[in-house]
Amino acid sequence: MSSKKSSLAALTLGAIGVVYGDIGTSVLYAIKEVFGSGHVPFTPGNIYGILSIFFWTLTVIVSIKYVVLVLRADNNGEGGLIAMLALASTAVKDKPKLRRILLIVGVFGTSLFYGDGVITPAISVLSAVEGLEVVSPAFKEGVIPITLVILFCLFALQKHGTAGIGRYFGPITLIWFVVIALLGISQIVTNPAILKAISPHYALLFMWHNPGTTFIILGAVVLCVTGAEALYADLGHFGKRPIRLAWFSVVMPSLVLNYFGQGALLLNNPAAVKNPFYLMAPEWALLPLVGLATMATVIASQAMITGAFSVTKQAVQMGYLPRLNIQHTSVKDTGQIYITFVNWSLFVAIVLAVVMFRSSSNLAAAYGIAVTLDMLITTTLTFFVIRYSWNYPLSLCIAATGVFFLVDLAFFASNLMKLFAGGWFPLLIGGAVFTLMMTWKEGRGLLNDKLRSDAIDLPSFLDAVFVSPPARVEGTAVFLTAEPGTVPNAMLHNLKHNKVLHQQNLFVTVRYHEVPWIGMNKRLEIESLGHDCWQVTVHYGFKNDLDLPKALQQIKGRGCELESMTTSYFLSRDTVVPTIGRGMASWREKLFAQMHHNASGAADFLNLPNNSVVELGSKIEI
């Protein structure tokens, strides 16, 4: 029992560090943006109303929607938009039109994650460093350079992995939550009546008397739920119970105390609106608080970067992105990965965001549209999971998700007002990623259709070949083929140029499925084709690590003896040639051809030994 408790405590501490870093640092800027906008006069009724809106936003969106409802929609224990997309699309596989719509919506939501992934580290680190301006105005000119240096160091460290320092994320973030709670309490004791704002009637009164202002400030209120998606995205790492326990026991109480403390400070000193978070602290504590805030925002940014790597890997394995060079940075933890292209693309985009917007207040204008649209998409997919995967009655599905849909829609509509003030930036990034993902998916479909139409039936081909068999050489040849039962181009080229066949020949097709994990007991299917030839199908989930040589070891004892020293892997390196008048638009075909050209080779992707790989090229028109 004690070991279970210690395991739960460790997972809960880990969840505090990874899952809640982003939402935990929103106290740095959320209240400041609502009152600093000038839309809300400093009256006790308005301050009570805003705090009440904050409290009930956290309660409805995070506590009820994500912690209670969405966490239930796991895909074999995994969470995140891709996992939910796989769950929803599988549930409606007998409705092809609806399935395609859901796939497009889900892919768009996944694309928006990258836009969010640019804004979050930029606004978090920048808002922490801006605390130096409270220490001394002389630091103002150094805020952006210091922010850029911190971000560069963060991204430069990624290739070395974070397993070593990752164990400190939970304790540091826990200290952060304790500190922000104490800061809030220090102000609440000066005006305990501020706690009355927990009552929803203050929020309702404010909205009733200020409908126009309410609509406008929702664009800033949404900042208090930044990172809510992480609760679901990190489900597979920690599990439901630790995530829920961390939220209700530590995170939400600390956030509420801090927000209410900032409200109490503003009641006593409206001038503190320039930076209410830091001005809650005594002067002697400012520099240590800036240091702690910077560490907390770096941890929050790290969680976002790690999430970007994980989402990219899943998208690659589900066929929405080309193969990328994925490096494992930890021997013990297979989830610790590094993708060079994603890392430095994110860094460049974040630097652009910091340099273009120059302050956390300006970045707050860019934040919101992508996040609220993502929340809308999550609610929509949740509806289809409840309806078609859980088979609940339609009325219950509407009741369960309808309120959340309306709340998300209100936040999204409010944030649309920030479109030209900066909201376009994450949308532009998300739109670009969406274009790449859909172009790759459709391009691969066209390419596979072309390969299928030109394919030669493998059993018939082998029968013809062995009428007058070529010379056999020792060892095993592994030919990769997109479709089982078809002759791979690499084999045709090998016979044409080398005029030999190996003693054993494996025709291997790798299948990716819309489930997170497929166990080793279901990894392999093997079928004898005669003449010491076998058709092998290897199955992977979208979170499995790919290692084809390891998977093929299961063949031993099933009629084929595989020795790594005498095994050669024959791959076809196809060059895509765009043509006019078929398939996609011309510019998309050219884009797909370029993506295909730049894709990482199958050898690296499938972890094949470099000294055993033979690549043979061919051209394919689409």
UniProtKB/Swiss-Prot annotation:
Which key words tag this protein in UniProt? Cell inner membrane, Cell membrane, Ion transport, Membrane, Potassium, Potassium transport, Symport, Transmembrane, Transmembrane helix, Transport
| Family, per entry | Belongs to the HAK/KUP transporter (TC 2.A.72) family.
Query: Quick check: keyword DNA-binding in the entry?
Result: no
- Entry membrane topology: Multi-pass membrane protein
Q: Does the keyword Membrane apply?
A: yes
Q: Where are the transmembrane segments?
A: 8-28, 50-70, 101-121, 137-157, 169-189, 203-223, 247-267, 279-299, 337-357, 366-386, 393-413, 419-439
Q: Which InterPro entries match?
A: K+_transporter, K_trans_C, K_trans_N, Kup
Q: Which GO terms describe its cellular component?
A: plasma membrane
HAMAP family the UniProt entry points to: Kup
What range does the record give for the signal peptide? Answer: none
Chain's role: Transport of potassium into the cell. Likely operates as a K(+):H(+) symporter.
Record field: catalytic activity? K(+)(in) + H(+)(in) = K(+)(out) + H(+)(out)
Query: Could you tell me where this protein is found in the cell?
Result: Cell inner membrane
Please report the name of this protein according to its UniProt entry.
Answer: Probable potassium transport system protein Kup 2
For this chain, one GO molecular function annotation is: potassium ion transmembrane transporter activity
Query: Mainly resides where?
Result: membrane
Question: Disulfide bonds, which pairs?
Answer: none
